[in-house]
Amino acid sequence: MEAKEKKYGEIEIEKAQLEAWPNPNPERDYMIEITFPEFTCLCPRSGYPDFATIKIRYIPDKYIVELKSLKLWLNKFRNRYISHEAATNEIYQALYDLLKPRFLEVVGDFHPRGNVHTVVRVRSDENYG
């Protein structure tokens, strides 16, 4: 059997790292909202694919996330066996550690499977309303 040559997109996703850029307006509080509607990962129990929309809201301090790096990094989850809760928390923690924002919220809105719809919300304050 021949070894399959990786496509350029697979290579880019494989080596993806989150990148921080300087905030152009650190003197001001402003909200950045990012939606990633094509998030996928694999159920650690069944191996079936899970699909979600990942919503990220944050008030930056010194840094903002570079969007292409975020897109490629989020795509790294597509072949990982990881629960909804673990995926959402990992995304939150990676962004929090990288950016150290004034506020951060990550929401994993997972498509229903087996008639169950799961929304996981992680945020840097205690207002979960």
From Swiss-Prot:
Pathway annotation from the record: tRNA modification; tRNA-queuosine biosynthesis
A molecular function GO annotation: preQ1 synthase activity
Swiss-Prot/TrEMBL catalytic activity: 7-aminomethyl-7-carbaguanine + 2 NADP(+) = 7-cyano-7-deazaguanine + 2 NADPH + 3 H(+)
Active site: C43, D50
Enzyme Commission no: 1.7.1.13
Entry keyword annotation includes Nucleus: no
Class of enzymatic activity (EC top level): oxidoreductase
GO biological process, one term: queuosine biosynthetic process
Main localisation: cytoplasm
Subcellular localization, as worded in the UniProt entry: Cytoplasm
Binding site for substrate: V65, E66, L67, H84, E85
Keywords: Cytoplasm, NADP, Oxidoreductase, Queuosine biosynthesis
Pfam families (UniProt xref): QueF (PF14489)
UniProt GO cellular component terms: cytosol
Role of this protein: Catalyzes the NADPH-dependent reduction of 7-cyano-7-deazaguanine (preQ0) to 7-aminomethyl-7-deazaguanine (preQ1).
Similarity-based family: Belongs to the GTP cyclohydrolase I family. QueF type 1 subfamily.
Name of protein: NADPH-dependent 7-cyano-7-deazaguanine reductase
Lineage: Bacteria, Pseudomonadati, Aquificota, Aquificia, Aquificales
